[in-house]
Regions:
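Metal-dependent phosphoester-hydrolase catalytic domains
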Residues: 5, 146, 151, 203-208, ...
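Soluble or luminal CAZymes and related metallo-dependent hydrolases
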Residues: 40-47, 73, 133, 174-179, ...
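Short, solvent-exposed loop/turn segments at secondary-structure junctions
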Residues: 24-27, 66-67, 96-98, 144-147, ...
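Active-site beta-strand/loop signature of hydrolases that rely on acidic residues for catalysis
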Residues: 18-24, 47-74, 141, 183-186, ...
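Active-site catalytic loop in hydrolytic enzyme cores
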Residues: 120-136, 140-189
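N-terminal, active-site-proximal structural segment of metallo-dependent hydrolase catalytic domains
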Residues: 1-135, 283
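Surface-exposed cleft-lining segments at the edges of enzyme active sites
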Residues: 33-37, 65-67, 154-173, 197-204
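Charged, glycine/proline-rich intrinsically disordered loops and linkers
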Residues: 101-125, 162-170, 239-260
Length: 320
C-alpha cells in the first residue's frame, strides 16, 4: 500500500480522487435480498455508517437518505454518513418532506413543494433555521474543499408505475415522488471540477426529461463534470441522453479552457457493471458519467457488497 492509498489526503495530493455513488435505501440492512429490521440509533457502528466508511470515498453521492424519520430512528443520516466518511463538506437536499401515514410509517406531504437544503452548520436554506421536519432525499459528501453549491428540485411524473418493492411479492403500483439534484464545484489538485449528484424518476421518459434538465442546469459550471447517481436508466441510455442535441434555443455544452472540444462536449460512461439487486446484481441503475475526461480515465472500478440497501455502491478513481 502506498502512502497516498493509506491516507485519502495523500491520494488527493497525488491527483487521484475516489468517487462513489450509493442508493442506501435509508440504511436498511438486507439479508438474502430481503430487508430486515433497522437497529435503533445511528452511532459510529450503525450499518449505514459502516457501509459508507468502508467505501473510503473522497466524493460520495448518496440517494434515498432519511432525515429525522421515525423508521430510521429520527437520525440525520446525511450528517451521520458525512462524519463516518470523514467528509467535512456536504449538503443534503430533501426530495420531499413526510408526515405519518394512516396505516403506519411515513407518506409524502403533497402540499410541500419547498426544496430544503441542509449542511454542516445545522441550518437549512429554503426552510430558514433547522425546523426538525422529517424528510427524504439525497446528499453529496466531499473531503475536498467546495467552492460553490447548487440544488434543484425535480418534479414527479404525473402517472403511476408498477414496481417491484423489496420485501414484497409481485408488483406494486406506485406513484412517483419528487426528486432532487445537487451540484458542487470542488477544488482538485489540478484545478476546479464539477460534481453532480442526483436520483431520477423510475417512470420511463420522465427520467430522460429530468436528466436533460439537469444537463442544462449545470452547463455553466466548470469542467470537467462528473455526474453520479441512481438514474433508473440502464445500459447506454444515460450516455445517449446526455450526448443528444441541445434543446432549441438553449446552449448547454461548452468548451472548458483546459480540455479539448471533443472531450468537453462528449459524455462518457466511466463504468459499465451491474449494481442491482445487491445480492445478485443483474442490471445497472447506478452510474458515473463524465465529460472533459478521457473515456478510459477511470481506475479501480468496483461494486463492493455492503450490509445495507438493495443496491451495490459503484466506486472508481479519476485523475483530478
Amino acid at each position: 500500500m502506498t502512502a497516498s492509498e493509506a491516507d485519502p489526503r495523500g491520494r488527493a495530493r497525488a491527483g487521484r480522487v475516489r468517487f462513489a455513488t450509493f442508493n442506501v435505501l435509508h440504511g436498511r440492512p438486507m439479508r438474502d435480498g430481503r430487508p430486515v429490521a433497522l437497529p435503533p440509533g445511528c452511532g459510529p457502528d450503525a450499518p449505514l455508517v459502516r457501509a459508507v466508511a468502508s467505501l473510503d470515498a473522497d466524493v460520495l453521492a448518496l440517494q434515498e437518505l432519511d432525515r429525522l424519520q421515525e423508521r430510521s430512528g429520527r437520525v440525520d443520516q446525511a450528517r451521520a454518513a458525512a462524519e463516518g466518511a470523514g467528509a467535512p463538506y456536504w449538503r443534503y437536499a430533501s426530495a420531499f418532506t413526510t408526515g405519518p401515514a394512516p396505516t403506519g410509517g411515513q407518506t409524502p406531504e403533497p402540499h410541500e413543494r419547498a426544496l430544503r437544503v441542509y449542511g454542516p452548520d445545522r441550518t437549512g436554506s429554503g426552510a430558514g433555521v433547522d425546523d426538525g421536519v422529517p424528510s427524504h432525499g439525497i446528499a453529496l459528501l466531499s473531503r475536498l474543499p467546495v467552492r460553490h453549491w447548487r440544488a434543484r428540485r425535480l418534479a414527479p411524473a404525473p402517472v403511476p408505475m408498477p414496481l417491484r418493492t423489496p420485501g414484497r411479492r409481485g408488483l406494486t403500483v406506485s406513484w412517483d415522488q419528487p426528486r432532487a439534484a445537487l451540484a458542487a464545484v470542488l477544488e482538485g489538485s489540478r484545478g476546479p471540477f464539477t460534481v453532480v449528484a442526483l436520483h431520477l424518476s423510475f417512470v420511463p421518459g420522465w427520467n430522460v426529461r429530468q436528466l436533460l434538465d439537469v444537463r442544462a442546469w449545470t452547463a455553466d459550471l466548470p469542467g470537467p463534470r462528473i455526474l453520479l447517481g441512481d438514474l433508473n436508466l440502464t445500459g447506454v441510455l444515460p450516455r445517449a441522453v446526455l450526448n443528444s442535441p441541445a434543446r432549441k434555443g438553449r446552449t448547454e455544452l461548452r468548451r472548458t479552457p483546459d480540455a479539448s472540444p471533443r472531450l468537453s462536449r462528449t459524455w462518457h460512461d466511466l463504468a459499465r457493471t451491474p449494481t442491482y439487486p445487491a445480492h445478485r446484481p443483474l442490471v445497472q441503475f447506478d452510474h458515473v458519467l463524465a465529460n472533459g475526461i478521457a473515456p478510459d480515465a477511470a481506475t479501480g472500478v468496483a461494486t463492493p457488497p455492503t450490509e445495507v440497501s438493495d443496491h451495490r455502491p459503484l466506486v472508481l478513481e479519476l485523475p483530478l
